[in-house]
């Protein structure tokens, strides 16, 4: 991480970039958040570790409107999203200085919790340069351990590859983390009867609280005016009156991003209800392939 910080300082100092788009520590040790850094001094708060799962491509839509270049840190999977945004003329390539950062798979705190690990105070082994295959977790109940691969986000188990598709320079090495078939879960759903499919999606979508996190984080949801914010009909409201509205929001959103979704998995990562929203988009992908 220090190499990345040093390079960012150099690019700020010589005027190549006006700001850096990366991550800073959040309120919890496993919750870093996207952040801008405009001075060398501010980079003391920069972090990059296994919990930096956020895809920063979408932030470049607004950054492209600012004066000067923005240094943006992109993981291999993020570069697919950035390329798609270039095709749609939503980001300005000339306003971006892309550093392709190494990735050994990003971590999902919920997968750690599902192993019965609670009361987390700190986690070691998540550093990007750390080759450790085990996370050491300090909790209020004592020290716990967890295999790194068992704590990875679902999208990392079906990784599209460790190569960056667009960059100005690379810092850090990436690891091939794929150990599962990308469409296995979709094929399981495809094998269900119509009644079983309906029951599956009904059970998942009934958990939705319409927080709009999936839409807000999605690089493919880049319309200047979203249909769901329209005041001409009731879709702008947060609460769902009935199950039809629950389905309408997600099905329409899936149709809107069909053919442009890069399967970055951000929708599922940020969902506070744990809904596997990426399965909708993968269903469209497998349908197009057939």
Where are the model-predicted features located?
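Hydrophobic, aromatic-lined core segments that form the binding pocket/scaffold
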Residues: 151, 210, 215-217, 221
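Active-site-adjacent beta-strand anchor residues
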Residues: 72-75, 208, 270
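A generic structural-conservation signal
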Residues: 21, 95, 217-218, 270
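A generic "binding-loop/recognition-motif" signal
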Residues: 78, 214, 267
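Ferredoxin-type iron-sulfur electron-transfer modules in oxidoreductases and energy-metabolism complexes
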Residues: 178-206, 220-288
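Short Cys/His-rich metal-coordination motifs, predominantly Zn2+-binding knuckles/fingers
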Residues: 159, 211, 264
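Iron-sulfur-associated redox domains of electron-transfer enzymes in respiratory
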Residues: 1-201
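Residue-level marker for well-ordered alpha-helical positions
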Residues: 5-6, 202, 212, 255
């Amino acid at each position: 991480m220090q190499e990345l910080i040093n390079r960012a300082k150099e690019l700020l100092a010589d005027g190549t970039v006006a700001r850096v788009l990366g991550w800073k520590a959040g309120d919890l040790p496993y919750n870093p958040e996207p952040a801008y850094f405009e001075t060398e001094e501010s980079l003391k708060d920069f972090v990059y570790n296994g919990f930096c799962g956020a895809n920063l491509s979408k932030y470049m839509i607004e950054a492209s409107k600012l004066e000067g270049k923005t240094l943006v840190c992109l993981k291999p999977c993020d570069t697919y999203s950035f390329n798609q945004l270039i095709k749609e003329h939503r980001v300005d390539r000339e306003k971006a200085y892309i550093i392709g950062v190494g990735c050994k798979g990003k971590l999902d705190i919920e997968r750690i919790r599902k192993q019965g690990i609670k009361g987390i105070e700190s986690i070691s082994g998540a550093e990007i340069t750390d080759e450790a295959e085990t996370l050491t977790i300090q909790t209020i109940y004592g020290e716990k351990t967890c295999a790194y691969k068992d704590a990875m986000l679902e999208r990392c188990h079906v990784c599209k590859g460790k190569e960056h598709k667009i960059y100005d320079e690379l810092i850090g090495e990436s690891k091939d983390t794929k150990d599962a078939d990308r469409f296995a879960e979709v094929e399981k759903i495809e094998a269900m009867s119509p009644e079983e499919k309906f029951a599956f999606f009904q059970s998942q979508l009934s958990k939705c609280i319409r927080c709009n996190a999936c839409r807000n984080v999605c690089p493919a949801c880049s319309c200047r005016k979203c249909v769901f914010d329209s005041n001409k009909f009731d879709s702008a409201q947060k609460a769902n009156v009935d199950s039809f509205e629950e389905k309408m929001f997600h099905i329409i959103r899936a149709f809107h991003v069909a053919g442009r979704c890069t399967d970055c998995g951000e929708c599922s990562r940020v969902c506070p209800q744990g809904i596997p929203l990426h399965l909708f988009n993968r269903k469209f992908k497998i349908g197009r392939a057939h």
